[in-house]
Amino acid sequence: MDKTVADLRKDYTLEGLSELEVDLNPFIQFKKWFDQALAGQLPEPNAMTLATVTPDGKPSARMVLLKDFDERGFAFFTNYNSRKGQELAENPLAALVFWWAELERQVRICGYVEKVSETESDQYFDTRPPNSRLGAWVSNQSEVIESREVLERRMQEFYSKYENQEIPRPPHWGGLRVIPTEIEFWQGRSSRLHDRLLYSRLDNGTWKIDRLSP
């Protein structure tokens, strides 16, 4: 008999998450978990859901790639004219979610968003493969197009334009940083009694840790 969606379930049994074991600094704790995801050779451990919302409350979400993190926040790069770029310009609040299934772990981050510096955007752009740099010029992200041929034609045009020369960063393309006000670490546990530890940023810049009911 075929399973239905309602029949799909997994019991989480790997390990727990204790207030006594986590770091008091959520960025250090994130790095610990991220390094373990890297060591476990998880596919694209830097993939994260980015949720945004319009000023009138219409939400949208998509997968993006984390490209830098430190105590300033979590950075990704995009076309500023895209839907997410426009929504964040109008309402600079966002949520991120990392899901590392093999480790039975989730990290949820909420905060406000700022552009990274021009220098940071330039430095990251210069590390991208040439075709990816061209792609930043080719795609008017989130706009309706007639067919894929539109992209392929524009790709050839920009390839010819920048052949044998440096490809500059488009002014509409760069980095955004989510500066967290809260970070939740979730560890799957048996019987759906999961461990959830929430770090909340206080006015003095320190963090408090609360355990949440699953």
Swiss-Prot record:
Cofactors: FMN
Keyword terms: Flavoprotein, FMN, Oxidoreductase, Pyridoxine biosynthesis
PROSITE patterns: PYRIDOX_OXIDASE (PS01064)
BP GO terms, sorted: pyridoxine biosynthetic process
EC number: 1.4.3.5
Catalytic activity from the UniProt record: pyridoxamine 5'-phosphate + O2 + H2O = pyridoxal 5'-phosphate + H2O2 + NH4(+); pyridoxine 5'-phosphate + O2 = pyridoxal 5'-phosphate + H2O2
SUPFAM superfamilies: FMN-binding split barrel
An example Gene Ontology molecular-function term: pyridoxamine phosphate oxidase activity
Pfam families assigned: PNP_phzG_C, PNPOx_N
Pathway stated in the Swiss-Prot or TrEMBL entry: Cofactor metabolism; pyridoxal 5'-phosphate salvage; pyridoxal 5'-phosphate from pyridoxamine 5'-phosphate: step 1/1; Cofactor metabolism; pyridoxal 5'-phosphate salvage; pyridoxal 5'-phosphate from pyridoxine 5'-phosphate: step 1/1
Protein residues bound to FMN: 62-67, 77-78, 83-84, 106, 141-142, 186, 196
Coiled coil ranges: none
UniProt binding sites for substrate: R9, K10, D11, Y12, K67, Y124, R128, S132, R192, L193, H194
Top EC class of this enzyme: oxidoreductase
Cofactor note: Binds 1 FMN per subunit.
Family classification: Belongs to the pyridoxamine 5'-phosphate oxidase family.
Function of the molecule: Catalyzes the oxidation of either pyridoxine 5'-phosphate (PNP) or pyridoxamine 5'-phosphate (PMP) into pyridoxal 5'-phosphate (PLP).
NCBIfam families assigned: pdxH, PRK05679.1
Assembly behavior: Homodimer.
Protein name: Pyridoxine/pyridoxamine 5'-phosphate oxidase
Name of the coding gene: pdxH
